[in-house]
C-alpha cells in the first residue's frame, strides 16, 4: 500500500482511521448499520419511523442479494460436480487388462510385477 489517495499522500493517522472504519464495516455490518440508524433517529426523531422503515428495506434487499448469490454459487458447484461426474470414465467403460484390474487403473503395475 502506497498511502496515496487521489494523488495526495495520506498521513498515518488518516490511514489508520480509514482502515479501522473499513474493517468495522466489513466485520460488523449489522452493528455499524444500527449505529447509523440510531444516530439518524436521535438527530431527527420526527423521521424515526421512515428511517427504521428504510433500514429494514435495505436489510431485506441485502438478504435477498446474498440469498441469490449463495444460490448461484451452489448451482455452479453442482454443475461442475455433474460435469466432472459425467466425464469420468467408470470401471465398466475401462479396458480391464487380463484378470488383474489394477493394471487398468495403474498402467505401470504390470511392468513391476
Curated annotation (Swiss-Prot):
It comes from Rickettsia felis (strain ATCC VR-1525 / URRWXCal2) (Rickettsia azadi). Belongs to the UPF0416 family. This is UPF0416 protein RF_0879. It comes from the Bacteria.
